[in-house]
Amino acid sequence: GLVDVLGKVGGLIKKLLPG
């Protein structure tokens, strides 16, 4: 679902970007 995709993308962003 969209929520799952957003969660995965958010996790990747948090890993790539500090804070």
From Swiss-Prot:
Organism: Neoponera goeldii (Ponerine ant)
Tissue note: Expressed by the venom gland.
Compartments in which it is found: Secreted
Main location: secreted
GO biological process: defense response to bacterium; defense response to fungus; killing of cells of another organism
Keyword Secreted: yes
Task performed by this protein: Has activity against Gram-positive bacteria and S.cerevisiae. Has non-hemolytic activity.
Alphabetic keyword roster: Antibiotic, Antimicrobial, Fungicide, Secreted
GO cellular component: extracellular region
Family: Belongs to the ponericin-G family.
Protein name as annotated: U1-poneritoxin-Ng3g
The organism's place on the tree of life at top rank: Eukaryota
